[in-house]
Amino acid sequence: INMKKITFVIPSRNNLEFLQLAYKSIRNLKGNHEILVLNDASTDGTQEWINSLGDNDLIVYHNPGPERIGIVGMFDKGIEMARTDIIMAFHADMVAAPNLDKHILKHLKRGTVVSATRVEPPLHPDGPEKMLMNFGIEVEDFDINKFNNWVSNDYQPKHGTL
């Protein structure tokens, strides 16, 4: 697929199972995007898993610790390290919906910011920037097929268009 590359900047700290799900969801997108994982002193096997991937479009920043940099510092570092002009801040516990990249690129115009709607389980209050839907709270409970089906068939954006 010939589309512009997006750099997905993902800070992570001891969030291996969610990070694996986030990584897989990005790799399932149509485009061959750059993923930049920033490991902030994780002790849960994150760095070993990253090292095992053999992904040429994966950039890694590893803070071996023991002092943490924190999520804001890691996002800043990731933006500095990105090799593409299009950057998406992505949390380790997020899942990329099918065609996320296509929709981001479709709406991106010079001088604009494009965002995606967050879909969260009903753990926190609703807000204008997110939708509350329960596809599972923990990795082992998350129903990716139900989520993908909802995105493909039933999802209507709160703001803007698809």
Where in the sequence are the language-model features?
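N-proximal low-complexity "stem/linker" segments adjacent to membrane-targeting elements
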Residues: I1-S25
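Acidic donor-binding/catalytic loop of UDP-sugar-dependent glycosyltransferases
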Residues: G45, A92-H107
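Glycine-rich, basic loop-to-helix element that forms the pyrophosphate-binding segment
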Residues: G65-A82
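Short beta-strand-to-loop element that shapes/binds the nucleotide-sugar donor at the catalytic cleft/hinge
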Residues: V114-L132
